[in-house]
Amino acid sequence: GLRSKGIYVLLIRQTQVSDFQRIFDINATEEEKTSRIDLARITQLDSWSDYHKVVVVEDEIIGFLLVMSEASHYDGDNFRWFVERYSRFLYVDRIVIDRTFARRGVGSALYSDLIKFAATQSWSTLCCEINVSPPNPVSHGFHARFGFKEVGRSSKAGAPKVVSYQVAEI
């Protein structure tokens, strides 16, 4: 097919329950950069999300983007950090792309779709956190291209991770 020639059509669509196993599989390859989630947690996160879409190429899910608004019941500590400081925002819980398609514009296509969605709902602030330790330079570069800037840092006592809190005004 076209995919073998490096030519493919990206379809971005709303996530369905039948996608959760593939989301689990893709996330499992990047747990050190995101965090571990099981199927029950994916179901819960999906129920709290305001935007949860997958990218499909030739009927195969190759990535996903999971986002909550400030009004979400999401229980994450990093999300709460933003709730305490910003009144209206969209929080990127995770964006994960299959390694086969890394650095080919798939993440950018998802973020462009998210920004369009945000505009329809009058959201102008995107928030996320990026690992500083262990470092995630690919994510830092990707988010910088979308205008994300550091607004704080967090490290939990005894925890191996240090994160950079990032905000982009869109």
List each language-model region with its residue ranges.
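Conserved acyl-donor/pantetheine-binding loop and adjacent beta-alpha core of acyl/acetyltransferases
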Residues: 66-94, 158
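Active-site rim helix/loop that mediates acceptor-substrate recognition in acyltransferases
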Residues: 32-58
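C-terminal "cap" of GNAT-fold acetyltransferases
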Residues: 84, 153-170
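Glycine-rich phosphate/pyrophosphate-binding loop shared by adenosine-nucleotide-utilizing enzymes
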Residues: 10, 60-64, 90
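Conserved active-site alpha-helix within GNAT-family acetyltransferase domains
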Residues: 132-152
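Conserved GNAT acetyl-CoA-binding A-motif
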Residues: 118-132
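Conserved acetyl-CoA-binding loop-helix of GNAT-fold acetyltransferases
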Residues: 97, 103-116, 145
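A short beta-loop-alpha structural element at the N-terminal edge
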Residues: 10-25
